[in-house]
Each structure stands twice: as C-alpha cells, then as structure tokens.
Amino acid sequence: MSALEKSMHLGRLPSRPPLPGSGGSQSGAKMRMGPGRKRDFSPVPWSQYFESMEDVEVENETGKDTFRVYKSGSEGPVLLLLHGGGHSALSWAVFTAAIISRVQCRIVALDLRGHGETKVRNSEDLSAETMAKDVGNVVEAMYGDLPPPIMLIGHSMGGAIAVHTASSNLVPSLLGLCMIDVVEGTAMDALNSMQNFLRGRPKTFKSLENAIEWSVKSGQIRNLESARVSMVGQVKQCEGITSPEGSKSIVEGIIEEEEEDEEGSESVNKRKKEDDMETKKDHPYTWRIELAKTEKYWDGWFRGLSNLFLSCPIPKLLLLAGVDRLDKDLTIGQMQGKFQMQVLPQCGHAVHEDAPDKVAEAVATFLIRHRFAEPIGGFQ
C-alpha cells in the first residue's frame, strides 16, 4: 500500500481526534504511524510541488486583472489545469509532482477569478463565458501569438470551464481535453442540494491546521498530503466579522441600544469593534469565496455540457469517481468511442487530490497514446 493510499484510507476515518501511535483507529501494522505520533495537519508550501509562481496581468476594456499561476516543467505540451469551485490551483499540487515524473510536459495551474490569489475587479462574475475568456486571455498573455500545444484539464466547475473554453476556440493551440468528475446530468441533479451542503460547512476555522483537519475528516479531501497544500488556497485570514451568527447578534445589539439611547452610539461602536476582534482572534480563518452567492451561475456552467464536450473535435478524456455518474448523452458517446473514459473507484469528488498517482497515470497514458508527450523513466 502506497503512502498516498494510506492517506486516502485515513481520510475516511470518522471525525474524532487522532489517536497517538495509530494515525486513527484502523488496526494493522501497515496503518501505524509510529509510537506517540499524531497525524500532521500543518500546511505545506506550494514550492514543494511547483517550480515557480507567476502573477499574469491581463488587460481588457476596464483595466488590468491579475491571475495567479503555478508552474513546473520546461519541455513538452502545456497542461493547463483548472480547479473546481471553491478550490484553487494548489489542488493540483500533488498531481503535478506525479505527472511531471511520468511524461515530459509543462504545468500551468491557474487560480480562476474569485478564487485563490487571483485579483480581478469583478470577482463576482463567475459566468462560464467570462471564465472561459479569462483562460484564453491568460494563455495569450503568457505566450502571445504562438502558444505551445496545450491540453486543458479541469475538475468539476473547472472541467465545465475547460469545455466552454475549448468549444469557443479560445485556445488556438488546443490538442486535448480532460474533464474530471463532472457530468451534466449528475451535476444538474446535485445543484438542488448544493446550498444545504454549503450551509453544513464550518463558517470559520481556528487555524490553518484546523481547516486541514476538517477537510480530511469530513471527506472533502481524502488524501492528507494533498489537503496540507490545497486547503491553504481555500481559506484566508478574516478581514471583518467572521461569523454570520456573531454579526447578527452584534447588529441586533446595536439596534436595541440605539432605540434606548441614540447618544450612546460611541460606546456601542466600541463594543462592536471589541466583539469583532474577539471573533477574529478565536476563528481567524474563513473561506476565500462564498460559493452560496455564485448560485445564479451554476446552471450556466453545466447545462448542455455533455453535448459541448462531445462536439469538441479533439481527443478527449473523462475521469470519473464512479460509472453511475454517466448521463445519457455521455453513455451514448462513450459507446460510440467519442472519448476515452476511466473510472477511479474509492475516490471522493476531488479525484485528482484523492488519487493523484492514478490520475497522473491516466493522463500520462492518454498523452503518450496520442503522441502528445514523451514518457520519462520507462513509463509506458
């Protein structure tokens, strides 16, 4: 059992404090982490997985936007990686190390607008059209009129944006397309329960370690190694009131105080600031993006996606966590041989984080089969 597989198994443990000497409650020497040791939830820097980082400036009618990219590799095709909603380019960190060791390629992992360290003027416009244009603009800003061969790989929302980018011909040198665990039918069905899922998440975290621990124990990311680098891109330090409940109680207190004595506003404001500071001190981290507020764009990401994917006239790969995720259009397309499909069981939705080696093998095999890239170290 590899270290990654151990992490995946550990990630499925029920939510409870880690036990010294076992890394959890599973029996067997193989699962042990050494006497007296606890699982390490400390964050890991991006530089352990990527070679460099760049902020790419994109000019448009209203000014400049800055997109964060993480890069590795110097030869071969560019794999342009697009993360899922709420995640960041750092979700591709462990996959990047795995794919770079298998084939000659270059990695460009992009923080989409509203996510990670990307800074745009209108971060709330997360329409498929806008984000697809962003991808094309970043490629143009990085490579000019002669971009290298590029394969788009996207997970969930990022997979949908990859398809919209490809179908709109926004990347002229596109040679391949890969979607990871995103299917129109399944995605559309899931939208109804998405708000409930988001409401069930913690609003704030006491520390980065606390956020990483939650992501693994909740099953959002089943691979501890990936969670330690990925969650840094999902949360940020709070700037104002960190808890909606805290905000509500503070506002109600202000209203009551003003009704009783309008002249007491100075003391109320002082108390409000003190309450804010206490909240920030106790739970200084929150989500970088409020996904619940992006609901109006969800339908546009996924509706018609299957036919858009099938109509792209380039080699295509679909990686799924379960075969039950296929919808009717993709089932027919798969039977007709219009794309290559691989199911990676025992994964959660974040397939490329839960099983980065297996995803890297699938992508590397796809690249070699189509003669897009050369193998490294005897990989076949």
Curated annotation (Swiss-Prot):
<feature type="modified residue" description="Phosphoserine">
    <location>
        <position position="42"/>
    </location>
</feature>
<dbReference type="InterPro" id="IPR000073">
    <property type="entry name" value="AB_hydrolase_1"/>
</dbReference>
<comment type="subunit">
    <text>Binds PPP2CA and PPP2CB.</text>
</comment>
<dbReference type="InterPro" id="IPR029058">
    <property type="entry name" value="AB_hydrolase_fold"/>
</dbReference>
<feature type="active site">
    <location>
        <position position="349"/>
    </location>
</feature>
<feature type="compositionally biased region" description="Basic and acidic residues">
    <location>
        <begin position="268"/>
        <end position="280"/>
    </location>
</feature>
<dbReference type="InterPro" id="IPR016812">
    <property type="entry name" value="PPase_methylesterase_euk"/>
</dbReference>
<keyword id="KW-0719">Serine esterase</keyword>
<dbReference type="GO" id="GO:0051721">
    <property type="term" value="F:protein phosphatase 2A binding"/>
</dbReference>
<feature type="compositionally biased region" description="Acidic residues">
    <location>
        <begin position="255"/>
        <end position="265"/>
    </location>
</feature>
<dbReference type="Pfam" id="PF12697">
    <property type="entry name" value="Abhydrolase_6"/>
</dbReference>
<feature type="modified residue" description="Asymmetric dimethylarginine; alternate">
    <location>
        <position position="16"/>
    </location>
</feature>
<feature type="active site">
    <location>
        <position position="181"/>
    </location>
</feature>
<keyword id="KW-0488">Methylation</keyword>
<keyword id="KW-0378">Hydrolase</keyword>
<feature type="modified residue" description="Phosphoserine">
    <location>
        <position position="15"/>
    </location>
</feature>
<feature type="region of interest" description="Disordered">
    <location>
        <begin position="255"/>
        <end position="280"/>
    </location>
</feature>
<dbReference type="GO" id="GO:0051722">
    <property type="term" value="F:protein C-terminal methylesterase activity"/>
</dbReference>
<dbReference type="InterPro" id="IPR000639">
    <property type="entry name" value="Epox_hydrolase-like"/>
</dbReference>
<comment type="function">
    <text>Demethylates proteins that have been reversibly carboxymethylated. Demethylates PPP2CB (in vitro) and PPP2CA. Binding to PPP2CA displaces the manganese ion and inactivates the enzyme.</text>
</comment>
<feature type="active site">
    <location>
        <position position="156"/>
    </location>
</feature>
<keyword id="KW-0597">Phosphoprotein</keyword>
<comment type="similarity">
    <text>Belongs to the AB hydrolase superfamily.</text>
</comment>
<feature type="region of interest" description="Disordered">
    <location>
        <begin position="1"/>
        <end position="38"/>
    </location>
</feature>
<protein>
    <recommendedName>
        <fullName>Protein phosphatase methylesterase 1</fullName>
        <ecNumber>3.1.1.89</ecNumber>
    </recommendedName>
</protein>
<feature type="modified residue" description="Omega-N-methylarginine; alternate">
    <location>
        <position position="16"/>
    </location>
</feature>
